[in-house]
Structure formats: structure tokens, C-alpha cells
Amino acid sequence: MKNFGLLVVCLSLATLVIPSDGVHIDGDAAPFFVVSQIQHTAGNPAVVGSSYTGRTAVAPPLNMRTNVAVPSTLGINSVNIGTNLPTFYQPTPQPVRSFKNTIDPSLLYSLMAGGLRGDGFLNQLNTIEFSSPAEVIDAVENAVENRADAIKDVIETVSGAVQNGDDEVEGIYDVFAEDDSENPVENLDDSDGVYDVFADAMEKKAEALENAAEAAAEYISDQSEEVDDLSEEVLDDDSDENDSTSSESEVEDSDVDLEVDVGIDLGGDLDLGGGVDLGGGMGMGGALNMNGGLDMGGRYGR
């Protein structure tokens, strides 16, 4: 990761998204509103003001999602965190003068369960307190790295299945070859069924390749659904657009790169495009591009 220092400045424009009136019984259909700023009063806990009403939000102590919006120019658009927020209320909030103010843990003390989006492998934020912007940065950075590790693990699993098929075929040569000819199988007596054994090994290799392809296709499908789900949850709010526009002007030269060079080529049977490229970081709104590999570095188009 590089240029993460700029994220401290950019987080001054970050927003939080919480349900405005609780969570409906049917779960994900909960209404959301966008909060334009974190507010703070001297001697009082940090509170959140509604960008629609100007009033302070009251969050029921229910299981809900919090969205930390990071400027799109950094390649990390939004990080959804499963959370269990406490009920809070501050009747007279004042606009914050600078994000250098500490975020009071009374507001974000109960970020629990679920982890960052991609619940299957990004389950790292369990009971964590964010008391400063630096901790938010660390959490985002760790999530990006964990996501890269998870993708790498999937590719290694596919690669391992293919390698097992190769090892099995090579084992046939090792067991039955008793001379130095270039193709020892041709010199074996087929009366012992050696050719049948070899053919069986080739069939098993083909089966391993097929299974690997199916596993990769299933994983890619899951990732595509995850991106679609996130796209549906991101709100097209004017205040959010203003935040993104302002942040781009401040950090237009910034970049956050994380590349995982773990590509495999299965000899034409399955080609993952040379590897997994996270491009500009963790761009959860990006398209799933199988022509050039699994590219999660796109930006959500607002």
C-alpha cells in the first residue's frame, strides 16, 4: 500500500451510512440515509447529524450495517461493516472544524461481527474501537490485504488440483519406466495393462482440470454477486457526490496499489488471465473482467 498518508486528509470528507429508523423485519430492506459529516462538541461524545434533516440520528441497538465511504480516487470506494450500534443522542451538535478531532469510541465502540464485505473471508473486525482516523485507515488496509490473501488461496487451490493431475501422470512414468528412452511408455508390454493404467491417469487429470474450472467459475460467480449486491446498496446521494468530487481535487495524484502476482495458466484448459489484479486497491464497485483476469480495481460510477 502506498500514499496511505493522504487518506488521513481524505477521511475528513468520509461519510457514515446508518438506518434512519431502524431495521425492518425483512432484513436488508431497511431504509438508509447519508450523513454528511461527523460532528463533535466540546466535552461531549462525537455524534452524527443527518444531512437531510440537520438533526442528530438515533440508532436503535440492532444489528445493522455501517458504511465508511472513502474517496474513489484512492480506489477504495466504500467499506461495509456489519455492526451493532448502541442507541445514542446528542441534542445540540456543532459542525466539526477538522477531522483531526478524535472519534469518540462511544459512537463506534461496537463494530462487531460480519467483518468487511465478503463475509466468507473478511471477518477481521470483531469488537473493535475506532478512536482515531489512523485506526480506520489500518482497518481498511488490513481488509484489502486479507481480500488479496483470500483470492490467492482460491487460485492456489485450483493450481493444486491441476498439479495433482500432473503428478499422477508423471507417476505412471516413474513406476513403469525401466529404460532411458525418450518415451518409455512406448517400450512397455501392453499385455500387463500398462496402457490402461496410463489412460486412466490421463482421465483423472482431465477430471481434475474440469473440477478446477468449476471451482474457479463458482468463485467468480460469487464475487460477481457480491459486487452486484454492493452496487444496489450504494446510494446516489448529492452530499455523497460532493464529498467524492472534493476529495478527488485534493488527492488527484494519489494511488493505492495492491497487486497479487499469483497467476496460473492451466495449459489452455483454464486461464485466469495471468493473475489477480486489485488495481487501485479495493474498488468494490468495479466490473468483473474475465478477459484480463479478476479485476477488482474499478470504481463505482456515480
UniProtKB/Swiss-Prot annotation:
Q: Where in the cell is it found?
A: Secreted
What this protein is called in its record is: Coiled-coil domain-containing protein 2
Indicate yes or no for the key word Signal. yes
Q: Does the keyword Glycoprotein apply?
A: yes
* A single cellular component GO annotation: extracellular region
Region of interest called Disordered, as start-end residue ranges on this chain: 221-257
Q: Which organism is it from?
A: Lottia gigantea (Giant owl limpet)
Q: Write down the glycosylated positions.
A: N242
- What are the disulfide bonds? none
Q: Identify the main location.
A: secreted
Q: Tell me the tissue specificity.
A: Component of the acid-insoluble organic matrix of calcified layers of the shell (at protein level).
Residue spans making up a coiled coil are: 198-234
According to the lineage, what is the superkingdom? Eukaryota
- Start-end of Acidic residues biased regions: 223-257
Which controlled-vocabulary keywords does the entry list?
A: Coiled coil, Glycoprotein, Secreted, Signal
Signal peptide span = 1-22
